């Protein structure tokens, strides 16, 4: 009888502790449907306008300075244009300074991303979001006015320290006569700077996808029109119709020869939904853990006292 009572009390305490833990570990971030205006002020609770969507919440990014040993900032977890989650509105320089479970991205430095913008199509100019860059003659063949012309391109080191080409209309390896085994970016996707997305974007591209050089030239001209009209942020010049992105930046895709551009809205929604779910799973609050330990600890102590009776 005594053993049955102890077992019953143990089960009751365990259920109560788990329930209390689940209530205490509710995610601190909340999903917002629109982007904010970037501000380096930590308490402003806004994200960089290069985000397609973002979460807003207390991510406990420690800022260390001479006056304050550690300050918890209100930060944005941003799903940015390169389909990678990163922290913004935070001065953290390394992943170790971010006290947030399982997110592998580090905080973006404010100064590295505040001037994010689409690149111009003027030769020899680089996007202002690059933290460092150099102009190089890539001998990138651009189809204009009925013939191919050589172009110059910028090799850019961006805030995440990935290298990529900008201001170049090359679409595959065969168009690039350069020692780097990378693909020149077409202008509409110059803002996509992740190597993972970069590689998968052209992974299924083949020159045979275009029926003729003329069709290729027309396609490039059409996409240049999108840049000029400000539509570049909504489309991708890809033959990939279905691309799945995970929160860590990896991706996979399938080819559809009839698809000339894919909208970013659906991909952004899917990815932000995935990141949201991941955030809800991973954002285990310290309060919830403490409540679990406290509840379970009291139950264990009670069982110990009863066992002595």
UniProtKB/Swiss-Prot annotation:
Keywords associated with the record: Cell wall, Glycoprotein, GPI-anchor, Lipoprotein, Membrane, Secreted, Signal, Virulence
Propeptide: 287-309
Lipidation (GPI-anchor amidated serine): 286
Cellular component terms (Gene Ontology): extracellular region; side of membrane
Maturation and modification: The GPI-anchor is attached to the protein in the endoplasmic reticulum and serves to target the protein to the cell surface. There, the glucosamine-inositol phospholipid moiety is cleaved off and the GPI-modified mannoprotein is covalently attached via its lipidless GPI glycan remnant to the 1,6-beta-glucan of the outer cell wall layer.
Subcellular location: Secreted, Cell wall; Membrane
Secretion signal, residue range per the UniProt entry: 1-17
Region of interest called Disordered, as start-end residue ranges on this chain: 241-281
Membrane topology category: Lipid-anchor; GPI-anchor
Glycosylation sites: 67, 115, 248, 267, 277
Role description: Probable GPI-anchored cell wall protein that may be involved in cell wall organization, hyphal growth, as well as in virulence.
Family of the protein in this entry: Belongs to the IHD1 family.
Protein name listed in UniProt: Probable cell wall protein PGA50
Organism: Candida albicans (strain SC5314 / ATCC MYA-2876) (Yeast)
Gene behind this protein: PGA50
